[in-house]
Structures are given as structure tokens and as C-alpha cells.
């Protein structure tokens, strides 16, 4: 038992001695932190249109009514697909069914101006169609494409920075340690101009709206320093 204890203590002593030696000789990570900002103008020639539809009816075939509503909207928007955001159903005091939809579609700006008049023409007794909102924010696909281009621009600039560091310090062997991306909200470059564009884009004019997209990168490059 005594021999086993001595052996164990010897092993522990060797282990801690080796650990201390490793810690003493372990290279020190030397880092350089900096922030990089890139921007890109994101343009769009389409808008997100939301329409509310309210129908008061005796009919109980709600699926058929919904199909009619969607078909009318598709016909007025050159066959563009509409998506239902919300649907509610209730009864008024006379016992009639009151059906309400909120639907949206992405369409070219050239169609938006004429669409308002066409939508209003659908309204009749017991059926009300109304454009609730027109959002000119670039689509998700357009923004993601722009973000991908901005990230690539950051990568290219970081590569240049690393090349310059390693030329200035040949024995440094600097490498990329990490990149953290931060994207602030989109901002309109000119709110007044954007408002004017919202009012009535010409049906015959190719309207293009834009927003400034910004990407901030917190970059850390590093090298190992021997003690």
C-alpha cells in the first residue's frame, strides 16, 4: 500500500511538473482587433402590396368564396400569386357571415399605381376590397444577395490586411482569428424622395427604389508569440 502511494505521488508530481513546463513554454496569442464597415445601395423595382377583403354573405361555402376572392385578385394583377396573411370569420347582428382576409403579393412597381383603381372597382354591395399598405422595402432575396456581396468584400479586404501585416512582419505569420458581422437597419437615403415615389409610380415608367445597406465587421487577426 505504501509503495502504491509513493508511486501515485510520483506520478502526480511528474504530471504537474510537465503541465507547468508546457504552460511556461506555451506561445502567447497576440491579437489585433479592428472594425470594418462596408455599404451597398440596394435597389428594387417591386413592392409588397397588402389588400384587405371583407365579404358579408349568406353563403356557407367559405372555400368557394375564398377561391373567388383570390381569383379576382390574380386576374387584376397579371396572374401574380397572392398569399393569405390572416383570415377571420364572424356573424353580424342579422346573422350574416362576415369574412375578412388580409392578402399580400410582390409585384413590379409599374403595376402598383393601376392596381389601386382596379382593386377599388371590385368593391360592391357586401364585398369591400381595399389596399391597406404598399411596402417598397427590398425583398428578402435582394437583401440577402447584397449581404453576400458585402461579406465577400469584407473577406477580400481582410485578406489584403493580412498580406500587408505579413509583409511588414515576415516572422509574424498573422492569420484570421474571427469575424463578427453586425447589420444595422436599412435606411432610406432620402425620405422625402421616397415618399414622393410612394404616391404614384407611373405605369409607363421603370421606377427603381433604393435603400442603403450597411454591414459592420468586427475583425480579429492574431499571431503566436513565443516566450
Curated annotation (Swiss-Prot):
Name the keywords, alphabetized.
Signal
Q: Which residues form the signal peptide?
A: 1-23
Name this polypeptide is given:
Uncharacterized protein CBU_0952
The organism's superkingdom is given as Bacteria
Give a yes or no for keyword Signal in this entry: yes
